[in-house]
């Protein structure tokens, strides 16, 4: 079984790292260590069946603060909107 997962970028929250329409290869998350600056795919904390791609910018007591790379405030729905997320929301990871 492959540990590789592909996700399509929708929107510009991760610009300039990823652009709308990019297909990005991630490693399936198997509860290995997450570090600041890793890019993750996770389940949205409040929207059912909705995944988001974000960068981990802070880790506090095994919870993650995630942000989009696009610095325009309105471009990203992230931890600024919903706070820290639990690692059980993480689906896949891309190391930097």
Which residue stretches match the model-derived regions?
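Extended hydrophobic leader/signal-anchor segments used for secretion and membrane insertion
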Residues: 1-96
């Amino acid at each position: 079984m492959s540990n590789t997962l592909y996700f399509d970028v929708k929107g510009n929250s991760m610009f300039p790292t990823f652009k709308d329409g990019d297909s990005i290869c991630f490693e399936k998350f198997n509860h290995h260590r997450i570090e600041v600056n890793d890019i993750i795919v996770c389940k949205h904390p409040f929207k059912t069946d909705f995944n988001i791609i974000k960068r981990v910018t802070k880790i506090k007591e095994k919870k993650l603060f995630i942000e989009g790379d696009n610095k325009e405030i309105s471009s990203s729905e992230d931890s600024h909107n919903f706070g820290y997320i639990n690692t059980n929301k993480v689906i896949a990871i891309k190391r930097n």
